[in-house]
């Protein structure tokens, strides 16, 4: 009996310790998520990581991340790395701007407020990245390029600006004008997306939307509230990006260790997609090796010329942050995980698509690594509103027609689910070798105009 009581006390103490640290809690998922098919949630886009070098256990880390491939992303036994993002330079190389601090710092991971931004470079988009320069003080950098070609690195409470990825970098601060509106949870953890006219959209930590004419001129808040999902969560680490079709946003519930995916036609009005955007357990290699990192934070994406995300990089840690102490076996790094890239596609119908539409014509483009005329499993394809195709429904293929190197697919209009609330159609299915295939396209009859940057004296 005494042993049972002692065991219960130990379990309660352990649970209290974790709760006190504020590191994890269990979130109940909506029941409807159980019916999502592959490709219905963003998390399905994470692909196995190519193997580089040999997996080793002769490195820091809890047993759940051993053995591992240290050449993925950036890793150094003498430094703890955290958030950052990658851009492809005009030199053809990949440039990672990441924050970090010495592993033997007096407070371990809690030394992060004094972190430094490093410039690391690799010939490959997934590393290994090697530090070549120091930018300056700052935490959780995000780099973007302005219309005039200059680069801007955002850090908490500051910025760095340069004509070149190689510097020199000039320190400064952003001007954030709430325009009389309530600022939502402060102005840290900012994330940026360049609009077609060269202006910039910003999402702040609390989910507020801001606009700037250039990215350096003042940002003005245009939203009255948060655009995040209306569910319980301790949200942070938003990442926003824009493609040739729409805006994308992922935000992380750090306490629940679950992230949410949203889409928007204009950057102001957002639609929450079902299913997890990411969660622990997504680091898997092509040879079957798994790295079970305790936490994934500071997601950023690497984009192609159409804005499509083809790689995610995360700050990861092997334990509770407060347990990462100086000169111990724990630390953090920044890793890279490939993403399935959406296909290039367009609707050829001229009239608005709805329940009365008889046939939907969709053009799928061929590109490097994808032959639209040979690679698709046509029987698996569904097209229509994401609310339908994410759950295995939607319009089915009626017939096909070749168009140059591309393919035009005629879908039956029945079951497309598209209405006035939809601004993008979704294609979902598989390739002939069983891999995920998806894509989004704009729809006829939809107004894609975006909110203007406020004019102020």
Task: Enumerate the predicted regions with their spans.
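Bacterial N-terminal signal peptides
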Residues: 8-17
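Boundary/junction segments of secreted and surface-exposed precursor proteins
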Residues: 342-363, 452-457
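Structured beta-strand segments within beta-sheet-rich domains
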Residues: 389-440
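Short, surface-exposed alpha-helix to beta-strand junction/turn motifs within ectodomains of secreted
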Residues: 372-390
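Carbohydrate-active catalytic/glycan-binding domains of CAZyme proteins
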Residues: 23-345
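Short amphipathic, basic-aromatic surface patches that mediate peripheral association
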Residues: 364-372
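Bacterial N-terminal signal peptides that target proteins for export
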Residues: 1-9
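Short beta-strand elements
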Residues: 342, 439-454
């Amino acid at each position: 009996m005494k042993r049972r009581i002692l065991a219960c006390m130990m379990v309660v103490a352990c649970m209290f310790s974790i709760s006190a640290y504020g590191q994890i809690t269990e979130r109940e998922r909506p029941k409807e998520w159980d019916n999502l098919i592959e490709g219905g949630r963003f998390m399905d886009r994470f692909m196995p990581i190519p193997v580089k070098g040999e997996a080793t256990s002769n490195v820091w880390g809890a047993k759940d991340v051993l053995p591992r491939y240290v050449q993925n992303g950036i890793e150094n036994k003498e430094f703890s790395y955290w958030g950052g993002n990658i851009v492809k330079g005009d030199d053809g190389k990949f440039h990672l701007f990441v924050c970090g601090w010495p592993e033997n710092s007096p407070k371990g991971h809690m030394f992060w407020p004094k972190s430094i931004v490093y410039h690391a470079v690799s010939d490959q988009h997934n590393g290994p990245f090697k530090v070549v320069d120091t930018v300056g003080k700052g935490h959780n950098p995000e780099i973007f390029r302005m219309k005039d070609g200059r680069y801007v690195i955002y850090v908490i409470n500051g910025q760095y600006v340069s004509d070149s990825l190689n510097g020199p970098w000039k320190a400064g601060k952003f001007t954030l004008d709430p325009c009389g509106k309530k600022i939502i949870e402060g102005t840290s953890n900012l994330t940026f997306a360049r609009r077609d006219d060269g202006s910039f959209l910003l999402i702040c930590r609390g989910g507020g939307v801001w606009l700037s004419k250039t990215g350096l001129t003042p940002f003005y808040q245009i939203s009255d509230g948060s655009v995040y999902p209306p569910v319980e969560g301790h949200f942070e680490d938003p990442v926003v990006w824009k493609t040739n079709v729409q805006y994308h946003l992922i935000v992380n519930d750090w306490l629940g260790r679950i992230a949410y995916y949203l889409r928007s036609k204009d950057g102001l009005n957002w639609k929450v997609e079902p299913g997890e955007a990411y969660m622990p357990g997504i680091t898997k290699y092509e040879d079957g090796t798994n790295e079970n990192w305790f936490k994934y934070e500071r997601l950023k994406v690497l984009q192609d010329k159409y804005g499509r995300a083809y790689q995610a990089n995360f700050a990861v840690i092997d334990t509770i942050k407060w347990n990462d102490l100086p000169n111990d076996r724990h630390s953090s790094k920044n890793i890279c995980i490939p993403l399935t890239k959406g296909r290039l596609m367009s609707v050829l119908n001229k009239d608005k698509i709805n329940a009365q539409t008889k046939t939907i014509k969709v053009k799928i483009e061929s590109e490097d690594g994808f032959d639209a005329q040979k690679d698709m499993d046509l029987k698996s394809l569904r097209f229509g509103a994401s609310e339908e195709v994410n759950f295995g429904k939607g319009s089915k293929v009626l017939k096909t027609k070749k168009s140059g190197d591309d393919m035009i697919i005629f879908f039956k209009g029945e079951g497309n689910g598209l209405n006035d609330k939809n601004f993008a159609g979704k294609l979902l299915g598989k390739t002939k070798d069983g891999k995920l295939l998806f894509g989004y396209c704009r729809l006829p009859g939809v107004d894609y105009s975006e909110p203007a940057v406020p004019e102020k004296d």
